[in-house]
Amino acid sequence: MATKKNQILVPDHIYVPKHEIISKTEAEEVLKKYNCKPTELPLIFVNDPAILGLGVKPGDMIKITRKSPTAGEGLYYRYVVEV
């Protein structure tokens, strides 16, 4: 079991893709581009270990940048919800 002294920070792990909060303007552009509502995006809980240090709140949108051997980089968007 991890103690506070040797606790693992999930966002710093090599297999966890980069997560970042996007601005309301950028979120609106994404929703317009994909012609969808925020609740139609994949959901992520506000207490998800990958986003704990970002200071997210329900209603925020997260951009996940994944590395891909074929595409190089892939973008993925998730909508933050309360548990």
UniProtKB/Swiss-Prot annotation:
Arranged from A to Z, the UniProt key words for this protein are: Cytoplasm, DNA-directed RNA polymerase, Nucleotidyltransferase, Transcription, Transferase
**Which processes are annotated in GO (biological process)?**
DNA-templated transcription
By its UniProt entry, which InterPro entries does this protein fall under? Arch_Rpo5/euc_Rpb5, RNA_pol_subH/Rpb5_C, RPB5-like_sf
Citing just one GO molecular function, the answer is:
DNA-directed RNA polymerase activity
**EC id:** 2.7.7.6
Query: What compartments host this protein?
Result: Cytoplasm
In its keyword annotation, does this UniProt entry include RNA-binding?
A: no
Predominant subcellular localization, coarse grouping: cytoplasm
- A Pfam family found in this protein is RNA_pol_Rpb5_C
Name the domain of life this protein comes from.
Archaea
List the GO cellular component terms. Answer: cytoplasm; DNA-directed RNA polymerase complex
Q: Which reaction does it catalyse?
A: RNA(n) + a ribonucleoside 5'-triphosphate = RNA(n+1) + diphosphate
Query: Can you state the subunit structure given in the record?
Result: Part of the RNA polymerase complex.
Q: What does this protein do?
A: DNA-dependent RNA polymerase (RNAP) catalyzes the transcription of DNA into RNA using the four ribonucleoside triphosphates as substrates.
Instruction: Name the family.
Output: Belongs to the archaeal Rpo5/eukaryotic RPB5 RNA polymerase subunit family.
Q: What is this protein called?
A: DNA-directed RNA polymerase subunit Rpo5
Gene name, per UniProt, is rpo5
